[in-house]
Structures are given as C-alpha cells and as structure tokens.
Amino acid sequence: MYDAPHQFEPLLPAPAQQEALLAKAHDLARSATQLAGLPVAGELRGLLRGMNSYYTNRIEGQHTRPLEIEQALARNFSANKELAARQRLAIAHIDAEAAIELRYSGESGGRQLYAAAAVRDIHRELFSRLPPEDLVTSEGEPVVPGELRQREVQVGRHVAPAHASLPVLLERWGQFYGDIRRGEAALLALAAAHQRLGWVHPFIDGNGCVMRLPKR
C-alpha cells in the first residue's frame, strides 16, 4: 500500500510531454485576459457557480436539473426526499464556492489553496452547509466536515494511500504545487494538482467536489 510521498511522483508530466500542454495553457490564458476588467467577468462568475454545481454533482451521481437547482435557490425543495437532498447539495456547492472565492482571493490566496489546511477547509465549507441527515455516505458511514478519512479505501481498481500517510502526502502536494504560480506553468500545475489530489483521496466522501471547487 502507498504510504510515502515519493510513491505519488512524478507530480508533473514528463518534460517531453509538457510542450504541447504549455501551448494550450498559453492559448487559454490569452483568451482569458480578454475578459479581465470587464463587467461581464463578474456576471460570468455567478453563472459559473450554478454550472459548476450542476456538473460536479452530475459527475458524482447526485444529478439535479437546472430547474431543480433554481427551485432550491428559492427554497422550494422537492417532496421527494432523495431529490431534496440533491437540491441541498447543489446549493451548498454554489454557496461554498462563493465563500471560497472570497477567502482565497488574490495571489496569496492562490498559494494558500495548496495546503492541507485549505483542502480540509474546502471540505468543511461544503459539507457543514448540509443537515445531519445528508452527512451519510451511500453505505451509511458518517461524513464529518473537514475530517480526513480514518480508514483504508479502494475506488475501482485504485487502492488509495494508507490513511495514516495522508498528512505527509498532502504536505508534499502543497509544497510542490504551491511554488508554481506564474504563467502557463501554473495552469499546468493546477491540472496536475487536481489529478494528484484525487489519487490521494483524502476524505471518506466528497473528494471530487473538493477537487473541483477551487479553480485558481
């Protein structure tokens, strides 16, 4: 079983593979600068929160349609208990994303995101918004907001690292990616950090949502 930082390296694609990826990152950054300073950027941010909630929960098997999300935002929840739970998760995701944007703003905030404390904070920010009846996995196991998993897990064919090694793995993850904060390399590091955090699988539930919530 994985239990040491060197076992989840390399943390970036091989140099020979980076050229094409950096070119794509350059094109993305150039397109994004066209929105900088425009009022539309703020409007898009609000729209994207709803879109992000829709897609991340669909990926996680907690699908809600856009109309159902709009109804939940108006506190008009379904009489169906399962759908109502999905609606609560959808609006919790939207509200958590807004809070995270404020808390981790600016250059210093972007660096702070690459830390074990921030990873736990994001999990807590999302799941603390849910009522106790929603804080249970499909297997009936309790979900504690912000708590790293306390047992071993396997997701499909992937056996996640030993739970006792999570602090040291997250420390290495943060040290490495937090130092890459400039230009196209930062975008490449963002994608790699997303994948590696999923490999670590720090929580008993909600890992995908936590990985996708910060987009810095």
Q: How would you describe each model-predicted region?
A:
Residues 1-216:
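FIC/Doc superfamily catalytic core
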